[in-house]
């Protein structure tokens, strides 16, 4: 997959775990594909396919991330799971049944979700949890 032109990866999004960072890149790429489809006025099947791919990958990523935090014995995992559910619900709300059929979000609504929920989550939550895990591991090594 090509890097997203609409939502390019920036070094400030880096969590510090290559696997999680790669998954975050993929989320941005999928969001970029959906944005292009919606902005170009593509047909229902193309937009629905792009939307379904983003939802599926978001859910898979959140599950993988939660397993990682659980395996690392992060005390923040329950709070993180709740945030993941909220973000997923907000993503799902970008597609809804209107009186005349299925309605998808506007490009601006999608951009808002990506920038204010998804990317903000990378920076504010994921980086913080990973930082606390690595600092905790360093403290354990120095006290041993």
Regions inferred by a protein language model and the residue ranges of each:
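Small-residue-biased structural context
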Residues: 1-144
